């Protein structure tokens, strides 16, 4: 029986209830490999994310202040903060790139982390055994590697068989990681207070983790430009 005050239910043999108009929702653009967020109606960062990231960065700032000392002593290492932000952003970009090329699995993520660690180790050993070029040369090579990664589209790699695709993706992803660690190793050799330098670098890494959410607006490919700008700021 209908609720009190509600319209009576249709009866067998009575008039047929029908909609006179058809409802159609807004037409949304499909998600792409560069912007793989099908449930995000508009390119934006939700306010809840902004509040969460702000709280994390504030907490990180306080902890680093307690561990690293006064902020005035950190000014001479501001370039290390830019390096930390750029490197974490680069690592995040590589994880997403491999997920798009090979699938989002624990094995693929493990390969990325192993590749990053191997690139870091090779850079450390290279810096220890070989006399590195001047910083402008290293920074120039790093920017070139980022530009190459920008110019090669994902579609070009997806058309390759699995093994060549993996080798090409590894070269594009880990060459900047290797060069970035050569830059870091060369700079860190000149620091006078390693604890403060690491604190500044860690704070920069936290900022880089927050900057990853820019991909909700710009897509992941633009992160390469952000990485290049951060390393440019570290150089100057």
Predicted regions located by residue number:
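Alpha-helical transmembrane segments of multi-pass membrane proteins
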Residues: 1-236
């Amino acid at each position: 029986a209908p609720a009190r005050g509600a319209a009576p239910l249709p009866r067998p043999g009575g008039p047929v209830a029908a909609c006179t108009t058809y409802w159609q929702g807004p037409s949304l653009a499909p998600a792409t490999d560069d912007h793989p967020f099908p449930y995000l109606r508009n390119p934006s960062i939700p306010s809840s994310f902004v509040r969460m990231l702000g709280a994390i960065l504030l907490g990180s700032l306080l902890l680093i202040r307690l561990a690293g000392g006064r902020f005035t002593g950190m000014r001479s290492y501001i370039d290390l903060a830019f390096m930390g932000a750029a490197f974490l952003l680069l690592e995040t970009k590589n994880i997403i790139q491999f997920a798009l090329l090979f699938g989002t699995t624990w094995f693929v993520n493990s390969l990325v982390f192993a590749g990053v660690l191997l690139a870091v180790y090779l850079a450390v050993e290279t810096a220890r055994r070989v006399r590195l070029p001047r910083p402008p040369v290293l920074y120039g090579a790093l920017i070139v590697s980022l530009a190459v990664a920008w110019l090669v589209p994902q579609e070009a790699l997806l058309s390759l068989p699995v093994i060549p695709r993996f080798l090409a993706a590894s070269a594009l992803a880990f060459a900047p990681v290797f060069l970035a660690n050569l830059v870091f190793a060369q700079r860190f050799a000149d620091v006078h207070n390693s604890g403060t330098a690491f604190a500044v670098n860690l704070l920069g890494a936290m900022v880089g983790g927050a900057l990853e959410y820019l991909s909700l607006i710009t897509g992941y490919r633009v992160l390469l430009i952000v990485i290049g700008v951060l390393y440019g700021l570290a150089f100057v």
